[in-house]
């Protein structure tokens, strides 16, 4: 199955280069692969061991090939030479030059917290939030908090899927304060569209971290990071209870594809129409951290 997205800068429909495409098709599309998935690959131990391997000095050998195969633009990175990284995870969580991701300063504009491919949903039903076409989940199962789920009924949900080629640090979409972050243990299914179509309620099943964020301009919002197969860990770099600026780093993922999800309350923001229209056509839109995705 080929994956396509809309390049927001050009409006072009492009094919995604999928890392481990054959592996994903076997794992999620065959009986033998599914057996391995359920017995081993979805377990924490598998992703933990794989993640530790990416911290070894020998993993550095993969970096140049990875850059070439996934066509990663290293001119954006602070350290452009692959030899400057001590291991693969060091490269995977690479930082970018500030000019590579300019932050939209307008206080009325909500910015994307991450690079990735986005689906955007307005007027969500707390009992039927869309995972993919024909598959839904309940907010109370995702949040594990019924009262919080009710607060976001009728609001906005934005799902930003990061593939292995992307910049894997995530940032704050507005200035404000994080009141708390809750860690929820779970499985480590892939969040690739191939898996999303096969496994029901993946976001509710996978490991995730939920932050309640009091923003300066858009009210309270939920910021969520979802782990996936081979994601060594989700690392939070902010300090709880401390004021942060718009675009400031919140944390990063170690190796693997992963997802960042934003929830805003009803009436808090108007999502940009191109994102909504592409979602209605069941196609993701490529966005970059720091660019506007909605406004008051």
Curated annotation (Swiss-Prot):
Is synthesized initially as an inactive proenzyme. Formation of the active enzyme involves a self-maturation process in which the active site pyruvoyl group is generated from an internal serine residue via an autocatalytic post-translational modification. Two non-identical subunits are generated from the proenzyme in this reaction, and the pyruvate is formed at the N-terminus of the alpha chain, which is derived from the carboxyl end of the proenzyme. It is an enzyme of class 4 (lyase). The record marks 257-258 as: Cleavage (non-hydrolytic). Keywords: Cell membrane, Decarboxylase, Lipid biosynthesis, Lipid metabolism, Lyase, Membrane, Phospholipid biosynthesis, Phospholipid metabolism, Pyruvate, Zymogen. It is found in: Cell membrane. Pathway: Phospholipid metabolism; phosphatidylethanolamine biosynthesis; phosphatidylethanolamine from CDP-diacylglycerol: step 2/2. It catalyses: a 1,2-diacyl-sn-glycero-3-phospho-L-serine + H(+) = a 1,2-diacyl-sn-glycero-3-phosphoethanolamine + CO2. Binds 1 pyruvoyl group covalently per subunit. The keyword Methyltransferase does not apply. The modification Pyruvic acid (Ser) is found at residue 258. The keyword Lipid metabolism applies. It is a peripheral membrane protein. Its EC number is 4.1.1.65. GO terms for molecular function: phosphatidylserine decarboxylase activity. GO terms for biological process: phosphatidylethanolamine biosynthetic process. GO terms for cellular component: plasma membrane. InterPro entries: PS_Dcarbxylase, PSD-B, PSD_type2_pro. The active site is at residues 115, 171, 258. Catalyzes the formation of phosphatidylethanolamine (PtdEtn) from phosphatidylserine (PtdSer). PANTHER family: PHOSPHATIDYLSERINE DECARBOXYLASE, PHOSPHATIDYLSERINE DECARBOXYLASE PROENZYME 2. Belongs to the phosphatidylserine decarboxylase family. PSD-B subfamily. Prokaryotic type II sub-subfamily. Heterodimer of a large membrane-associated beta subunit and a small pyruvoyl-containing alpha subunit. This is Phosphatidylserine decarboxylase proenzyme. It comes from Alkaliphilus oremlandii (strain OhILAs) (Clostridium oremlandii (strain OhILAs)). The lineage of its organism: Bacteria, Bacillati, Bacillota, Clostridia, Peptostreptococcales.
